[in-house]
């Protein structure tokens, strides 16, 4: 009997314990293939330091980054019917919901809150893409409507950060009903004379693009975001033609007049604050080329609305 094997090694193992190493310590940049340590990525707002590629940012992290001091009032998730169609494909919809809730520690895809950005009060609504692809269902639609109602009650602007694959197929027509519901909510905010700004993130597609994501007074997009109704591959297979390089990206849509500005993630809070202060006729510090561009975009929007 080997006393080292049978006695010493088990004792050492029991004292030290077995460490489970997370499988997401290093994250690969989709653009360059560079491996980035997850802490470095988080500290840089989920933007790859070398390439500048904008990764998907968790919804709660985005709200904390947006609001002054990371402080805001988080809105409660409205209570709605769960799995009303008792839907099942390769897996029960109810099980998919449970898995997404465990993964994201959220009730559904929408996270919303009230706070200040450079002292300006606003409501922000963010999609969590990791919750079933940020898809729009009954719970998400209700959360969005409630957020608009809160903005109207507070008499403050609303900023939307969509990141979605579109309507949630597991809820069928009940999901599609959220398109007109959210559109009406946007109209009510505008009737109240309050600004509505959309910050388009990667990806913004499907029914979300066909409704509240493209109804803003101003549309800002993050660099390289895919913004479309149907995806490039689907269109190419339908028309049997190759689409232009960069088709449906933020930069392509800016060039063709579909979005107003492409703004890097680090600059979004300041850009929103300046823009909203101008729209709400509050004093705003305007310096530099980016601010001049913001002013020109706002003036152009006013001219179109007039």
Curated annotation (Swiss-Prot):
The keyword Cytoplasm applies. Coiled coil: none annotated. Pathway: Lipid metabolism; malonyl-CoA biosynthesis; malonyl-CoA from acetyl-CoA: step 1/1. Signal peptide: none annotated. GO terms for biological process: fatty acid biosynthetic process; malonyl-CoA biosynthetic process. It comes from the Bacteria. Its EC number is 2.1.3.15. Component of the acetyl coenzyme A carboxylase (ACC) complex. Biotin carboxylase (BC) catalyzes the carboxylation of biotin on its carrier protein (BCCP) and then the CO(2) group is transferred by the transcarboxylase to acetyl-CoA to form malonyl-CoA. This is Acetyl-coenzyme A carboxylase carboxyl transferase subunit beta.
